[in-house]
């Protein structure tokens, strides 16, 4: 039996594994090899690694974790999890299973894009979701935002405030906001095209947005804030409480509502903030926190002294 199983081999999972390895815990990291930021060539806001390739960060992270003899990394797909604290069973797609005393869920989320021809192909390479991650590189160029709801309209206002004065909101079938937000868009000189978007083609720096009617729109980059869903249903199957946006609810120690189950990265968040902060560097921090408090959990169980304020 492993002391800890970390499900997910991205920044959060590897960070948790690194911390556990340094405490000489017998841990298994299970990596499906499907990171959310796979389309991205660069990551940002990571001190000393600004502009670094995410895939290279994962490669180096795996090498560091592999340097600790008590930690094993396994490329596999988890299909089911069951059990309770001190005796969880994790099943794999190849028919094997392993047991662990504690779990860290770092399985991440999946972006859900509108079904528009060319959008998925260009996502991360001309079509971007985050102004913090990609706004600087797109500054002072003709930009567009895709979508007509509150979130996309606020994204358009933010980009116009921080990065460009040449921005078009492509509402993709209709602007679904109230008069105050419509007035804000007008006041900030953001034109709105409400025709449905049918196709996007080109490359980063030279996109063409085609509509169901009217002239195509030439832009340097397109921003869109997609919906998300959990990459797996493992947390739900264990009974972990989920927040309205689908994130796994955790406390300040990255504990879920199920004893012995921790969660880290963009799969989880505190209930109090209005939304997640799904950045690589915050995922690393979450993974470290989860491992530190999980370590304390195992230690206190060993010496039979509970952590104050925990179940």
Regions found by a protein language model. Give the residues of each.
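Short, well-ordered coil/turn residues at beta-beta hairpins
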Residues: 8, 106-108, 113-115, 146, ...
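FAD-binding core/adjacent interface of flavoenzyme oxidoreductases
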Residues: 1-4, 72-141, 248-257
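Active-site glycine-rich loop that binds ribose-phosphate moieties when present
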Residues: 125-132, 145-157
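FAD-site-proximal beta/loop scaffold in flavoenzymes
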Residues: 121-137, 227-281, 293-296
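A Rossmann-like FAD-binding core segment of flavoenzymes
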Residues: 59-92, 97-100, 163-249, 299-310
């Amino acid at each position: 039996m492993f002391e800890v199983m970390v499900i997910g081999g991205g920044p959060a999972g590897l960070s948790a594994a690194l911390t556990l390895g340094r405490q000489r815990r017998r841990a298994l990291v299970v990596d499906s090899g499907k990171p959310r930021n796979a389309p991205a060539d660069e990551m940002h806001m990571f001190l000393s690694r600004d502009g670094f390739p995410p895939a290279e960060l994962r490669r180096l992270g795996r090498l560091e974790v592999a340097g600790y003899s008590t930690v094993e990394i396994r490329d596999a797909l988890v299909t089911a999890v069951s059990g309770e604290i001190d005796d969880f069973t994790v099943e794999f797609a190849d028919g094997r299973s392993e047991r662990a005393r504690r779990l860290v869920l770092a399985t991440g989320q999946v972006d859900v894009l509108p079904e528009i021809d060319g959008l998925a192909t260009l996502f991360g390479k001309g079509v971007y979701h985050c102004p913090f991650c990609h706004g600087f590189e797109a500054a002072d160029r003709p930009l567009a935002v895709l979508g007509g709801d509150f979130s996309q309209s606020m994204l358009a206002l933010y980009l116009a405030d921080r990065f460009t004065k040449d921005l078009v909101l492509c509402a993709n079938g209709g602007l679904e906001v109230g008069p105050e937000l419509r007035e804000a868009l007008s006041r900030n000189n953001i034109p709105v095209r409400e025709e449905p978007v049918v196709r996007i083609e080109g490359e980063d720096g030279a996109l063409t947005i085609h509509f169901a009617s009217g002239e195509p729109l030439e832009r340097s980059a397109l921003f869109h804030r997609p919906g998300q869903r959990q990459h797996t249903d493992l947390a739900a199957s264990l009974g972990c409480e989920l927040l309205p946006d689908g994130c796994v609810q955790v406390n300040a120690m990255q504990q879920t509502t199920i004893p012995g189950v921790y969660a880290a990265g963009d799969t989880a968040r505190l209930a109090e903030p209005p939304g997640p902060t799904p950045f690589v560097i915050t995922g690393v921090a979450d993974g470290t926190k989860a491992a530190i408090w999980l370590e304390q959990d195992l230690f206190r169980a060993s010496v039979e002294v509970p952590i104050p304020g925990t179940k």
